[in-house]
Amino acid sequence: DLREYNNPLPKWWLWLFYITVVFGLLYFILYPGLGTWKGIKGWTQASQWEQENAAAEAKVAAYLAPFASMTVPELAANAQAMATANNLFQNNCAQCHGADGGGARGFPNLANSDWQWGGDPDSIVQTIANGRVAAMTPWGEVLGEEGVDAVVAYVQQLSGQQSDPAKAAAGAAHFQTFCMACHGPDGKGMAAVGAPNLTDGVWLYGSDAATLKETVTKGRAGQMPAFQDKLGEQRVRLLAAYVYKLSGGAQ
């Protein structure tokens, strides 16, 4: 016959179960876990992160303190500062400008002397700290296809490329009417408004006729993010010194 036996659980299992229950109750008393109950310790993930981040920032501030009194050119000549700046660059800038600062289509080359917004230390600091918005007006509807082709021919001529002389002559008139306000009457650009030099053979998006036509027709809308809030003043200055050195400014 079948009969029911009384088989108690092992003592160690029972004690482990009791300990688990007690631990759970204590946890929910000390820490948040039940509805809006915040726990008697008042602990949150956010507060723990803030404390740990503050401690880390204090260590960083102590490390960066010797660089605070240096100018950008002095930082560019300091090996320790540049080693730190290289780490900052690889973590914050290389994604767009490349590990060597050589840039890519739509992202400026930082390793040459061609500067859209100015290459002096103050201008570089300003660019990194506050970012830049490089808006090129679309002229397709204003000029029409024939007018766009003429301006493209003239811009190619300005930069030493071969183009149709008749179209270039017509494009020169359009250029003086619509383009010179930003790029200047000679096409050499204006750093104050971020208008690039069209005569030096350095191109952000490309210099072939098709790309130039796209640029003139549709315009461009480049944007450089601001890093002041993310990195703080001292790290921005280190990055400025790194970029300044990349471009040969420290030589």
Regions found by a protein language model. Give the residues of each.
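Basic, gly/Ser/Thr/Pro-rich low-complexity segments located predominantly at protein N termini
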Residues: 15, 29, 103-106, 136, ...
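Compositionally biased, intrinsically disordered low-complexity regions
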Residues: 26, 35-37, 41-44, 100, ...
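A broadly tuned "polar low-complexity/structure-edge" signature
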Residues: 10, 98, 124, 134, ...
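Gly/Thr/Ser/Pro-rich low-complexity intrinsically disordered regions
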Residues: 158, 205-206
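Periplasmic c-type cytochrome electron-transfer domains
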Residues: 1-76, 117-123, 127, 138-156, ...
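Axial heme c-ligation environment in periplasmic c-type cytochrome domains
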Residues: 104-111, 130-148, 152-166, 193-197, ...
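Sequence/structural segment immediately N-terminal to covalent heme-attachment motifs in c-type
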Residues: 77-102, 112, 116-119, 125-130, ...
